Amino acid sequence: EVENASSEYIIRDHSRVKFEEKKRYLQAATALLTGKYGEGVIKLTLKDQYYNMREMVEPYPEVIDKACQAMEKAGVTPIVRPIRGGTDGARLSYMGLPCPNLFTGGMNFHGKYEYCSLNTMQKAMQTILNLIELWGK
């Protein structure tokens, strides 16, 4: 149909406050267009899928500490920085199991130049084995 269009967006942010601000921005834009063109011209559906795991992981610094130890033991220099990606870890963190993101060997995610390095994937595997050992002690 020529007279219809749809758009889908994924809202992500490190900050829950900024995350909510972005949703309010979409609501305000919807209200503006509805006011200008009338009811039924635009429809906004918001569905929260997950939140950034930071607020669920930060209270448990030992989780990050062990991850860093496991990486170092695998010969990897840890780089601790926030990411906005949606992962199973975000969902698990909100279910009560704090799960920070770890590396997997992939680069340039979600684009035509995405790839995985076998060497880095092996380092990721060794990191997981090291985590099992560290948490098992």
Enumerate the predicted regions with their spans.
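Metal-dependent amide/peptide-bond hydrolase catalytic core
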Residues: 1-137
